[in-house]
Amino acid sequence: MAKYRAGRINEEVKKEVSNIIHNDIKDPRLSAMVSVTDVNVTKDLKYAKVYVSIFGNEKAKEESLQALKSSVGFIRKEVGRRVKLRNTPEVIIEVDNSIERGMHIDELLHSIKENESNDN
């Protein structure tokens, strides 16, 4: 039962953080496409690790990450207002590169497939 509750909390916080990032943060540095891939809230509801994937060039990624990290107080306040929890978790932003790694692996597999078809 506790795992089910934790999963619901994680999904609810993920949905709200995503909405906050896309609709409420007005930082001009947030120009790259930012996607919330996962959220892990600790059992005591003190911390919420928010995993984000940022698409764009390296400069845009760095600026977007800095914008997100400078907005953690605002994000925490909004999460506390929108999600009714005993404690409002402290938001920790982490970069998730799994989507980029997956795209790179897909490109490698595609190039291998092309090389095999050219050899035949």
From Swiss-Prot:
Tell me one GO biological process term.
Answer: maturation of SSU-rRNA
Keyword NAD on entry: no
Compartmental location? Cytoplasm
Write out the GO cellular component annotations.
Answer: cytosol
GO MF annotations in UniProt? ribosomal small subunit binding
Sorted alphabetically, which keywords does the UniProt record give? Cytoplasm, Ribosome biogenesis
Top-rank taxon of the source lineage equals Bacteria
Please give the Pfam families that the UniProt record associates with this protein.
RBFA
- The answer to whether UniProt assigns keyword NAD to this entry is no
Oligomeric state and interaction partners are given as: Monomer. Binds 30S ribosomal subunits, but not 50S ribosomal subunits or 70S ribosomes.
Similarity field: Belongs to the RbfA family.
Function per UniProt: One of several proteins that assist in the late maturation steps of the functional core of the 30S ribosomal subunit. Associates with free 30S ribosomal subunits (but not with 30S subunits that are part of 70S ribosomes or polysomes). Required for efficient processing of 16S rRNA. May interact with the 5'-terminal helix region of 16S rRNA.
Q: Name the chain's protein.
A: Ribosome-binding factor A
What lineage is this protein's organism placed in? Bacteria, Bacillati, Bacillota, Clostridia, Eubacteriales
As recorded in Swiss-Prot or TrEMBL, the protein's gene is named rbfA
